[in-house]
Amino acid sequence: MPAIEVGRIAVVIAGRRAGQKVVVADIIDKNFVLVTGAGLNKVKRRRMNVKHLEPLPERVNIQRGASDEEIKAALEGAGISLE
């Protein structure tokens, strides 16, 4: 299992959003990823350091750079909650 990949569910472990679950929407470079809460929690789409994320075994099938609506539909289809 790659640590960080597109579609991977992760928990934020540092900063104001610590404890929140997010979905990796895109990989920017080796240190940063684009994450989102897809409107299901208070985490907005933003760049985040990979050192501040703890990946979970859950994953949804999405394309790189998918919109929040597409990610939300994939999460609901897979029965995964970000709460």
Swiss-Prot record:
Keyword Nucleus included in the entry's annotation: no
Record field: transmembrane: none
Quaternary structure, from the entry: Part of the 50S ribosomal subunit.
Name of the protein this chain belongs to: Large ribosomal subunit protein eL14
InterPro entries per UniProt: Rib_uL2_dom2, Ribosomal_eL14, Ribosomal_eL14_arc, Ribosomal_eL14_KOW, Translation_prot_SH3-like_sf
CDD domains, per the entry: KOW_RPL14
MF GO annotations: RNA binding; structural constituent of ribosome
GO cellular component, one term: cytosolic large ribosomal subunit
NCBIfam families: PRK04333.1
Family: Belongs to the eukaryotic ribosomal protein eL14 family.
UniProt superkingdom: Archaea
GO biological process, one term: ribosomal large subunit biogenesis
The organism of origin for this protein: Thermococcus kodakarensis (strain ATCC BAA-918 / JCM 12380 / KOD1) (Pyrococcus kodakaraensis (strain KOD1))
Keywords, sorted A to Z: Ribonucleoprotein, Ribosomal protein
HAMAP family for the chain: Ribosomal_eL14
